Structure formats: C-alpha cells, structure tokens
Amino acid sequence: MQRLAPALRQDNVPLDLISLIKTILAATKEISFRVSQGHLGDVMGSTLDENIQGEVQKQLDVVANELFKDILLESGFVKAISSEEEDHSVAGDENGKYIVSFDPLDGSSNIDINSLIGTIFSIHEAPKDIAAGDDDMFKQAGDKQVCAGYVLYGPSTMLVMTTGSGTHFYVLDRTHGGFLLVERNVQVPADTQEFAVNMSNQRFWQAPMQNYISDLLAGDTGPREKNFNMRWIAAMVGDIHRVLCRGGIFTYPADSRKPEQPYKLRLMYEANPMAFLLEQAGGLAMTSEGRIMDIEPNSIHQRVEVIMGSKNEVEKCLSYYN
C-alpha cells in the first residue's frame, strides 16, 4: 500500500500543499488518540460555553479546535483559518499561500455515546490582496477548493480526501503512524435504495421534500416501485462516508422551525468539502436551487440546504422541485 506523500505526488499535488495536508493530518492523529482514550483521556462531557452557532461545546470540541489552531498557525503555510468554533477567521502568516476552513469535530453529540465522529477540512488558495484575518478572504466558491477531506474516527481512523484528481481512501497505520492509501478513485453508485435524513423534522419541510420522502417510504407499493432503507448516524462524516462506500442520498433540507434560519449545515466547512469529495467520486451535491460549489459565500458561517449523493437519486429528488 502506498503512503500519503507518494500518492499525492502521483496526482501532481504541489509540495507546499502536501506539507500543509501533512500538517492537518498531524492534528487529526492526536485527535484520534484522544478519541480512543474516551473517559480515560478526561475529554468527555460538555463545557458551559456555546460556540458561534449557539451550540453547547463538548470538551473534545474545544480540545480539537485548539489543536488545529496551534498546529496550523505555527506552520507558516496558512494565511488564515476559519473554524466552526471561532466567531471570525484567525490570522496566520501574512505570506501563507493557503487558507483552511474546518469543523474540528463533526457529530460531537456522538462523543459521549462512543459513536462516529470526524474532522472536516477545506483548503483554498489565499487571495494576495486581502489581509490575513479579514473574513472576506474566505468568500470563495467551493469550486475553487484545492483540497478537501475528512478524517473519520471509527473502528479504524480513515482519511477521505481529494485534490481534484479523484476521491481516495486512506487508513491510519497505527504501527508506523502514517496514512496508507487503500482505495483510489472511489466511485459512488449512480442508483441507490438508501436515504439519510433526520425524519424528526419532517413536519417542517417544504412540500417537494415532503412528497419525495413520502414516495420513498411508500416502497414497492408506491410510485417508486421499490423499497428504500433509511440510515441516520447524526454525524455528516458518517452518513457521507456510507454514501461514498455504497451509494445513497443524504439531505438536510430547508425547514420552517426557525424562519430566520431555514438551513442547518454550514457551507464553508461542511457542504463545500463534502460536495468536492462527492463530485470527484461521480456523485452530485446540490441545493434545491443549484450546485453547492457554485454558491458565492456571504459569510464564513453561512448555512445552506444540502441534497447530495448518488447521481440519479439526487436528480430524482430535485425533480420534485420543478
């Protein structure tokens, strides 16, 4: 099995970007260890604080965020970072070539029940004409990403990443401490009989999504004439990983619970990186109005509707909106 750096060089990834990726992964290795320690590592439970999203922070959220901040800002590779846990972007090296957006611990509500969690990251080139620390630096569409990926802390620690030359799977070799390539050019099946959605919000959805899900639930006696299974891990990294492995559709649709905030997932460090990974694997990543990676961001914490996964099923879902 091929090690990370040679695999990236094979895809003609620039050496400075390889170095930045390795820096990010150094932080994820430490997080993986902390996660594996569980209660023994004294990082379980919640803090008394809320992040910018209004979410109560888990202790491991804070630990993971500080790890990423420290290692990235000291690297010299990044001009600025933005995190789910930070109100604004944080300035790095004014001469840094890249900017990094990340969710240090996706699915943190799963920590205390020992279920799937992960880290999501997205890398863009840094604009030269905007000062480090200015949030406007991050207002770039997803199709300008130079790298995106996530690290899934499960039975094994897996890296799923793309630099624009396909989506590849790596596994952390704990014996030697490096990530090894285990599957190159993953392809998402175009058709599926699995869907992932938080059904507890169904009554708040718009009519097109209500109708689409109702037809899935009707199974082989309904208009789709086949049965569908529902899966829901409550961590985007876990649900998208299943889609990448065996197909499916994942959606977090618009809802009316909070009219001033109809969307749940964040564009910069959740939707965009997952969209890049899925498109590179032959899938689709959309809102009900268009392609996710075409969206021009208006803030680093912007939220969006998400409909992504197997190509034919995403297109079928979108047909309900026409």
From Swiss-Prot:
Location within or outside the cell: Cytoplasm
Q: Provide the catalytic activity annotation.
A: beta-D-fructose 1,6-bisphosphate + H2O = beta-D-fructose 6-phosphate + phosphate
Query: For this UniProt entry, what is the primary localization, expressed as one broad class?
Result: cytoplasm
Q: Quote the EC number.
A: 3.1.3.11
For activity, the cofactor(s) needed are:
Mg(2+)
| InterPro entries according to UniProt | FBPase_C_dom, FBPase_class-1, FBPase_N, FBPtase
> Where does this protein act, in terms of pathway?
Carbohydrate biosynthesis; gluconeogenesis
Q: What is a single molecular function from GO for this protein?
A: magnesium ion binding
* The protein's enzyme class: hydrolase
Q: How is the cofactor bound?
A: Binds 2 magnesium ions per subunit.
A single BP term in Gene Ontology = fructose metabolic process
Homology family: Belongs to the FBPase class 1 family.
The protein here is known as: Fructose-1,6-bisphosphatase class 1
